[in-house]
């Protein structure tokens, strides 16, 4: 009897790549993003409601919210949805989730928004934990975020 399983000889941490969201989700978010005025945020919220597992939608809401508590809430939803997605993709609580993989960016944006909004509402311990987690997931992200 032979074992045809691949052998991972890497001594480094594993890297997780989230699957790309369905194209219709991205298109829906893109349409919502083209709205102008107060209708834009409403359209983005509606898109998140139609596709609650779309991490980019939660990240966008967190980044655009005009209230720190709202930003925190949107970021936290995206963060927890992202943890669920990471686990489904094989992540076991450690290893890299790199910014260079576009499909990972929604989760990383949510985590960055959570870090920022936690600091804004005085949750400095959570802000520090999020900063450390971001560094552990992708030590080079600071230089790449936003690109």
Predicted regions and their residues:
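Short, solvent-exposed interaction modules
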Residues: 107
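Acidic interhelical loop/turn segments
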Residues: 95-97
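N-terminal alpha-helical interaction modules that lie
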Residues: 1-56, 61-93, 102, 111, ...
């Amino acid at each position: 009897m032979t074992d045809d399983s691949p052998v991972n000889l890497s001594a480094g941490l594993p890297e997780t790549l989230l699957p790309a969201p369905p194209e219709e989700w991205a298109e829906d978010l893109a349409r919502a993003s083209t709205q102008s005025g107060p209708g834009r945020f409403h359209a983005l919220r509606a898109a998140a409601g139609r596709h609650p597992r779309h991490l980019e939608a939660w990240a966008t809401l967190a980044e655009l919210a005009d209230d720190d508590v709202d930003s925190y809430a949107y970021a936290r939803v995206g963060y927890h949805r992202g943890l669920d997605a990471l686990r489904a993709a094989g992540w076991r609580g450690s290893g890299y989730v790199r910014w260079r993989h576009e499909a990972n960016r929604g989760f990383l944006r949510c985590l960055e928004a959570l870090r920022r909004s936690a600091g804004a509402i005085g949750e400095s311990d959570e802000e520090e934990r999020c900063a450390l987690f971001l560094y552990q997931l992708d030590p080079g992200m600071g230089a790449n975020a936003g690109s």
